[in-house]
């Protein structure tokens, strides 16, 4: 075990994490040069397109160091985005060290900081890796100073590399062997293994990625998931090189995979403890928690015929990603669809993009919302996932919404614009620290303000330089109301949103104006209203077509003309009372793009 090194790679998006993993594999000759391709560990099409890592990946590398000892290096390539921060924390718990990759041209970013602090909490040995030193704009000394001043760790063991050109990779491998400690554990103890991640394989069922802390896992033994008590018989155990390779057993300190004919990824919770069903360990490994979605959105197929196809597609995606939830719902305006829960906005985008590309589904999405807590006057507390389920306002005592603690890292030049943006979004400043030419701004913000366009606006006002990290920071009471959109006296449930009362009139007017442009004119007048309870706060009218019923008349008595106009008036009145306004799907999609 003394020659095993388990380490994770921590980096912000686009700082060269997956490229560095490619170079480490090349240096250790883990992959046939003919099969080598960029971002080898990012297996999903969407990961390669967006240049992001969504699922944790692992690879075992064999390395002969300068001391002529043979070492086994287990590398875990973790997601970098805030939505997947729990997966990162479990990947880090499986390791003893981390490579902190920082772009020599951009310096530290907010999400890098958040993940480094998680690594420090796990008592990791951290090796700073300053990447992209081949670029003319690289400033490695400034980045070293940032790492020392902001994170407070030594940069004496920092390694300067160019993942693109392969410069410094040999020195980095020597540093991994020298500075990262070997794993601790006892093969003779009862089995205790950490579930790092899981995914679905069409032939093997659910494949589980594990780090064995104590004991060993062999094929044929019966294992138990400690969070739910489910028992399974292990069929295969193996390692990734990065190809799957079966082995006879996984021993304490090692990272690998197992299969056990598990049919549902829902039974395999990231962070769970796996033990021997016949001789179980007595305690969980620390840090396990059930993942809960924080952003909710309804998905409806544009064609009602595709409802069953959407259900099957969501079930297939759920096999690989059990962190999103879905349940069927129906809307009077949009028909049958699903109410889905996600870990964040990137998670929502990834799932909807996969539905579009992999399953060829055209979807209508409702406005994203968060989970509100409604305290009733009878002291009961309800959780509101969908604005259409809002109870009678007269029975509500107060409403609470989730707040987050956001860290924004940006160049000092843009601090004024970003503070203005945070204040617009009802933010409360917690801290502001300047390091070198960068500022770290900490704000408390309502999550509902973040899920719309905050990230886009932040990038816009900072010319793309700001980076954001956030974590849920409890619930707070707030002045919230349900904004309803009423068309010709009928409420359109798909357009209902929960909103902060002082912003309701502006948002209501924006939606009404947008709908006025989008709804086609009918033979009768269409009233579009935004209302809170029974009170209308904004109104627009779509004027009717006017058919010239008197065109066929020439000369004669004016009473004939009056009679025809009166008949038209009565017809329009009857039409208005029985006519249903036909709102095209595109109108919903456009109206919901209105930003609060």
Swiss-Prot record:
Question: Gene encoding this chain?
Answer: lepA
Give the species.
Neorickettsia sennetsu (strain ATCC VR-367 / Miyayama) (Ehrlichia sennetsu)
- List locations, semicolon-separated: Cell inner membrane
* Enzyme type, top EC level: hydrolase
The text of the family note is:
Belongs to the TRAFAC class translation factor GTPase superfamily. Classic translation factor GTPase family. LepA subfamily.
Query: Pfam families from the entry?
Result: EFG_C, EFG_III, GTP_EFTU, GTP_EFTU_D2, LepA_C
Summarize where GTP binds, as residue positions: 14-19, 131-134
**Per its UniProt record, what CDD domains does this chain match?**
EF4_II, LepA, lepA_C
Function in brief: Required for accurate and efficient protein synthesis under certain stress conditions. May act as a fidelity factor of the translation reaction, by catalyzing a one-codon backward translocation of tRNAs on improperly translocated ribosomes. Back-translocation proceeds from a post-translocation (POST) complex to a pre-translocation (PRE) complex, thus giving elongation factor G a second chance to translocate the tRNAs correctly. Binds to ribosomes in a GTP-dependent manner.
Q: Which biological processes are named by the entry's GO terms?
A: positive regulation of translation
- Its EC number is 3.6.5.n1
Any idea where the tr-type G domain is? 2-184
What is the name listed in the Swiss-Prot or TrEMBL entry for this protein?
Answer: Elongation factor 4
- The organism sits in which domain of life? Bacteria
Task: Return the InterPro entries for the record.
Answer: EF-4, EFG_II, EFG_III/V, EFG_V-like, EFTu-like_2, G_TR_CS, LepA_C_sf, LepA_CTD
Q: What is its main location?
A: membrane
Q: Which UniProt keywords are listed?
A: Cell inner membrane, Cell membrane, GTP-binding, Hydrolase, Membrane, Nucleotide-binding, Protein biosynthesis
Q: Which reaction does it catalyse?
A: GTP + H2O = GDP + phosphate + H(+)
Entries under HAMAP family matching the protein: LepA
GO terms for cellular component? plasma membrane
Record-level Gene Ontology MF annotations: GTP binding; GTPase activity; guanosine tetraphosphate binding; ribosome binding; translation elongation factor activity
The family database entries (NCBIfam families) matched by this protein are listed as:
lepA (TIGR01393), small_GTP (TIGR00231)
Q: How does it sit in the membrane?
A: Peripheral membrane protein
